């Protein structure tokens, strides 16, 4: 990856998250050098829960549409942004309370795309993919810690959605 050519790396996980993807991705950026790496976090491409309430799984109408399902992700926009960077166009990332918008420069040779959404994209978009997994108990513990502190979520909501 340090050959000066353009490379795109996918870092994703299975389950509801908190598997260590973001932590690993940030450390990898530091290791490879910020001056040559873009980190595109895919979490802002997850459709907000209030809009997902409008969807229902036909076979199981009583169940919620969680982020574990592709329909909960704005995949076309994420794919467009990845292709733009790969094609030499800068992008401005989606603004979220926990992740302010920033400009990513297409001049950087390495693009790391990190998040659950990546699992639902065509594998040919990436030169290398790394998949993380964590058990349910560890996932809940990490989500309670991170989502309360960073995403301003209530512990009760996290526990309820973890059971969904």
Where are these regions (language model features)?
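Small-molecule kinase domains that catalyze NTP-dependent phosphoryl transfer to phosphate-bearing small molecules
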Residues: 150-164
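Walker A/P-loop
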Residues: 22
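Hydrophobic anchor at the beta1->P-loop junction of P-loop NTPases
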Residues: 11-13
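Post-Walker A helix-loop "phosphate-sensing" segment adjacent to the P-loop in P-loop NTPases
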Residues: 30-39
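Conserved nucleotide-sensing/catalytic segment adjacent to the nucleotide-binding pocket
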Residues: 38-41, 47-98, 110
């Amino acid at each position: 990856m340090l050959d000066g050519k353009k490379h795109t790396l996918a870092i994703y996980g299975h389950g509801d998250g908190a598997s260590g993807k973001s932590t690993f991705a940030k450390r990898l950026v530091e290791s490879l050098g910020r001056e040559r790496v873009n980190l595109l976090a895919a979490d802002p491409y997850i459709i907000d829960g209030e809009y997902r309430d409008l969807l229902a799984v036909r076979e199981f109408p009583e169940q919620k549409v969680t982020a574990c399902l592709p329909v909960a992700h704005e995949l076309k926009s994420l794919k467009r942004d990845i292709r733009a960077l790969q094609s030499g166009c800068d992008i401005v990332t989606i603004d979220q309370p926990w992740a302010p918008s920033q400009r990513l420069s297409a001049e950087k040779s390495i693009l790391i795309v990190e998040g659950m959404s990546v699992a639902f994209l065509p594998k040919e978009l990436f030169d290398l993919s790394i998949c993380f997994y964590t058990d349910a108990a560890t996932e809940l513990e990490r989500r309670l810690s991170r989502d309360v502190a960073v995403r301003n979520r209530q512990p009760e909501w996290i526990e309820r959605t973890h059971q969904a």
